[in-house]
Amino acid sequence: MDIISQLQEQVNTIAAITFNAFGTLQRDAPPVQLSPNYPEPPATTTVTDDATPFPEQPKQLSAGLVKAAKQFDALVAALPLSEGGEGAQLKRIAELQVENDLVGQELQKQLEAAEKELKQVQELFGQAADNCLNMKKPE
């Protein structure tokens, strides 16, 4: 897997961790009194699958997020540096475009030859089918 694909996968991982962290915190956070004028909210007991106490959950979730972010940073650091600056990059892009045009022209020639051959095969097939139908005895 190339570095760009790994970076995309890591971004998806960070997004999933963040999404799950917000969801878990919303689900398991204890109720908070909004104003002294309102009565104290009732305590809720939520059973979680991993049975981690709520005060520990934010620490675990943030540790996972930091770990994923560090992996992302390591992947970014592994990206090759461009040599020669912007001018060299533009020159390389121009070279690649010329090469792409040449390959495109060659592919176009091959496509035209293949279409010509397909027409010939279709004509021969039609002739063969007509010959077979003409040889068939009437009933």
From Swiss-Prot:
Q: Which GO terms describe its cellular component?
A: mediator complex; polar nucleus
User: Which segments of the protein form a coiled coil according to its record?
Assistant: 92-132
**Where do the segments described as Disordered lie?**
28-58
Q: Which SUPFAM superfamilies match?
A: Mediator hinge subcomplex-like
InterPro entries under this entry? Med7/Med21-like (IPR037212), Mediator_Med21 (IPR021384)
| Predominant cellular place of this UniProt entry's protein | nucleus
Q: Which UniProt keywords apply?
A: Activator, Coiled coil, Nucleus, Transcription, Transcription regulation
**One GO biological process term:** defense response to fungus
Q: Is Disulfide bond set as a keyword in this record? A: no
Where composition is biased (Low complexity), the residues are: 43-54
As for subcellular location, the record says: Nucleus
Signal peptide (from-to) = none
Q: What happens when the gene is disrupted?
A: Embryonic lethal.
Task: Give the family from UniProt.
Answer: Belongs to the Mediator complex subunit 21 family.
This protein's assembly is summarised as: Component of the Mediator complex. Interacts with HUB1.
Q: What does this protein do?
A: Component of the Mediator complex, a coactivator involved in the regulated transcription of nearly all RNA polymerase II-dependent genes. Mediator functions as a bridge to convey information from gene-specific regulatory proteins to the basal RNA polymerase II transcription machinery. Mediator is recruited to promoters by direct interactions with regulatory proteins and serves as a scaffold for the assembly of a functional preinitiation complex with RNA polymerase II and the general transcription factors. Required for embryo development and defense against necrotrophic fungal pathogens.
Mind telling me what this protein is named? Answer: Mediator of RNA polymerase II transcription subunit 21
Q: Which organism is it from?
A: Arabidopsis thaliana
Per the record, the gene is MED21
